[in-house]
């Protein structure tokens, strides 16, 4: 079957990597809305228009299921997408519940885009696990821009992260949530600057497992018809070289 994966940019390639591991026999069309990245600092009505334009593009190329591999896009539009389209749709959300469960009676720090943090969906997510008193959040829009610009130099990234994290006493935290798919490119750098006792958690594997279960529940036979083809679009234009660059980076993480 043909699965669409959509993100504001290249962050969702980290989700594609997990999908290739768990659902290797499917065909994938990846859409990076690089003309409009980043979403996390824009007006949500503007972003909603970008999202539906991207999804229509993928529908016109025959997708049978969709992964919204962007926490910001999920928080803004996942409900509207599911009400509009009849095929299986899976979104991303910060992995707050597993982070709370693994925090060992310490606090949880959620890293995301400013728009994700501002949305009611995020507040509801924290409220559902009754964790308002132990969950803090921090927007890191610069990290999205670094990933999009293929900037992974520790001499640039580490000072940025240390500055942004400086208001927090990290000894108080047990888990760090990467609540934006772009942030996974920097997992190794996070590990170098946070205390050893802190676990880093993301929602990628859980999202792909949910996709597989949803496909089976919907009657799809996963791996039965696809050839493992991957097509990558940057705002409507094929860009296979860009895909390869980021997949190569992920092999090293």
Curated annotation (Swiss-Prot):
GO MF annotation terms: glutamate racemase activity
GO biological process assignments: cell wall organization; peptidoglycan biosynthetic process; regulation of cell shape
Source domain of life: Bacteria
Keyword terms, alphabetized: Cell shape, Cell wall biogenesis/degradation, Isomerase, Peptidoglycan synthesis
Pathway(s) served: Cell wall biogenesis; peptidoglycan biosynthesis
Active-site residue numbers: 70, 180
InterPro entries recorded: Asp/Glu/hydantoin_racemase, Asp/Glu_race, Asp/Glu_racemase_AS_1, Glu_race
Listed PROSITE patterns: ASP_GLU_RACEMASE_1
EC number: 5.1.1.3
Reactions the enzyme catalyzes: L-glutamate = D-glutamate
NCBIfam families (alphabetical): glut_race
UniProt similarity note: Belongs to the aspartate/glutamate racemases family.
Family matches, as HAMAP family: Glu_racemase
Entry protein name: Glutamate racemase
Upper classification of the organism: Bacteria, Bacillati, Bacillota, Clostridia, Halanaerobiales
């Amino acid at each position: 079957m043909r699965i669409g994966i959509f993100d504001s940019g290249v962050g969702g390639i980290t989700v594609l990597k997990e999908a290739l591991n768990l659902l290797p026999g499917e065909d994938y069309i990846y859409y990076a809305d690089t003309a409009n990245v980043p979403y996390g600092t824009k007006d949500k009505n503007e972003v909603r228009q970008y999202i539906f334009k991207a999804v229509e593009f993928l529908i016109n190329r025959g997708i049978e299921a969709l992964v919204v591999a962007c926490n910001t896009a999920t928080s803004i539009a996942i409900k509207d997408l599911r009400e509009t389209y009849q095929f299986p749709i899976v979104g991303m959300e910060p992995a707050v519940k597993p982070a709370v469960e693994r925090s060992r009676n310490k606090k949880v720090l959620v890293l995301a885009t400013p728009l994700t943090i501002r949305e009611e969906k995020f507040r509801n997510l924290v409220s559902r696990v009754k964790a308002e008193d132990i969950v803090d959040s921090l927007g890191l829009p610069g990290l999205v821009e670094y990933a999009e610009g293929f900037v992974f130099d520790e001499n640039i990234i580490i000072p940025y992260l240390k500055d942004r994290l400086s208001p927090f006493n990290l000894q108080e935290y047990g888990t760090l949530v990467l609540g934006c798919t772009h942030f996974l490119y920097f997992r190794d750098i996070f590990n170098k600057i946070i205390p050893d006792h802190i676990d880093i958690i993301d929602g990628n594997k859980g999202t792909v497992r949910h996709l597989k279960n949803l496909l089976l529940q919907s009657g799809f036979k996963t791996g039965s018809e696809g050839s493992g083809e991957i097509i990558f679009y940057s705002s409507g234009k094929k860009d296979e070289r860009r895909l390869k660059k980021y997949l190569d980076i992920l092999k090293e993480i």
